[in-house]
Amino acid sequence: YGKCNHKDTMVVGMIDYGTCSLSNLQPCNESILDGIRVIFKKDKRKEAVEYCAKVKALGYKVFVQLVSITSYNDEELQDLIKLANDIEPYAVSMVDAYGLLQKDSLLHYFYMLDEGLKENISLGYHSHNNFQRAFANCQEMLLCNTKRDVLVDATVYGMGKSAGNCPIELLAMHLNDYYNKNYDISQILEALNCNIMDIY
């Protein structure tokens, strides 16, 4: 994979904690991947973050993915923040697994994480669209007042588990219109038409 030029793209894989032994992972410099997202529920947070530290030691950018963020109370989230600060992952992301987050709850979790995490850790949001909040919540995330990098996930046509995710074509248009980005919407729509619509 050494000849694969990623240019400005970060290629990231995902591991559901407990399903992939570390022995199955090559060092990052021998892999096509730049980073790995590790997803886990709160009852596994201690051992999952320890696993994340070992993945990071292999050279990967590690994303600590908090599945079902709405299941965390404040004390549990503070515990997670301490665990994350100890290993300094590339990012910590809120995963709204059932699309339950309303604006107030989203901002509550965001600012708890923003206040507690070390400044070099990016803060992300992975939406699900059960209550049609995915795109709106991504917009709220982008408006949050923070000095750290903010990551918002989206997929072509919003395809994803259950009700799906935030549609990347909408998010890209929003970023172009309000954040001076230059995403090629026609390329996204071409990918949608050529690869996705046949299965919908």
Where are the language model's segments positioned?
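Catalytic cores and adjacent flexible loops of soluble metabolic enzymes
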Residues: 1-200
